[in-house]
């Protein structure tokens, strides 16, 4: 007959293991407290970001009321983006099948500067003067053209002048990344997301280790009728 002590939490734990259980659950309580605080901080930062976005939405409504007022649109300079997307964009613009440029005497001549470059469900314009505002995309992205660029540095209008920038549009809550739009996430949010994931994985790992320990104790107890003299996989 198996005797179950009233002060034991598990039947297969040897005497004195209650202290280990108490320590384990104290650790779990501490971990859960930290996880709760981190998750609350993460959601607070997300709410603040969304609140800021809604504030921008109010100015957007005002911009629509005044029919594309300049204050409605936001100019942003593009920062480095996806290498793959940038490479695909360049290949499309300078590809023979696009019909956008005509190569002549070492120069790429723009065929029709009034026509935007249509690539990936987005329109790109040869400079701010060619840009056509869109109320649904209030962020105006400006990608400056480096004169030393081996490709865009050799692009010219038909009047021998060179475009200074490529302009495209993004939604209100986006940033300009290369020739694409990217989400407006912050380093702070990314770090906390990573910490939350690491903490969750750590807690799950501890639970798995404890389950293995309990299974080993149970197996040993059922086979020998008493607990182990030592605890395997002790944390």
From Swiss-Prot:
Transmembrane feature ranges: 27-47, 187-207
Tagged with keyword Cell membrane: no
Cell location: Membrane
Keywords per UniProt: Membrane, Transmembrane, Transmembrane helix
Record's keyword annotation contains Cell membrane: no
InterPro entries documented for this protein: CX
Membrane topology: Multi-pass membrane protein
Domain named CX: residues: 124-185
Primary residence: membrane
Any Gene Ontology CC annotation: membrane
Name of the protein this chain belongs to: Uncharacterized protein C07A9.12
Biological classification of the source: Eukaryota, Metazoa, Ecdysozoa, Nematoda, Chromadorea
């Amino acid at each position: 007959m198996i005797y179950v002590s009233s002060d034991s939490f598990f039947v297969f734990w040897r005497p004195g293991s209650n202290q280990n259980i108490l320590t384990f659950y104290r650790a779990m309580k501490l971990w859960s407290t930290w996880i709760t605080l981190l998750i609350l901080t993460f959601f607070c930062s997300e709410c603040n970001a969304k609140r800021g976005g809604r504030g921008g939405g109010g100015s957007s409504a005002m911009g629509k009321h005044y029919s594309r007022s300049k204050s409605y649109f936001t100019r942003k300079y593009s920062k480095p983006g996806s290498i793959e997307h940038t490479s695909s964009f360049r290949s499309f613009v300078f590809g023979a099948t696009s019909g956008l440029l005509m190569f002549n005497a070492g120069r790429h001549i723009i065929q029709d500067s009034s026509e935007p470059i249509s690539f990936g469900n987005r329109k790109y314009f040869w400079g701010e003067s060619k840009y056509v505002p869109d109320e649904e995309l209030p962020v105006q992205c400006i990608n400056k053209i480096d004169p030393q660029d081996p490709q865009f540095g050799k692009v010219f209008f038909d009047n021998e002048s060179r475009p200074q920038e490529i302009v495209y549009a993004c939604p209100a809550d986006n940033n300009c990344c290369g020739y694409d739009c990217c989400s407006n996430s912050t380093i702070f949010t990314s770090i906390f997301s990573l910490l939350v994931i690491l903490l969750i994985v750590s807690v799950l790992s501890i639970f798995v280790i404890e389950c293995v320990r309990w299974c080993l104790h149970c197996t040993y107890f059922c086979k020998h009728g008493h607990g182990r003299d030592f605890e395997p996989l002790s944390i």
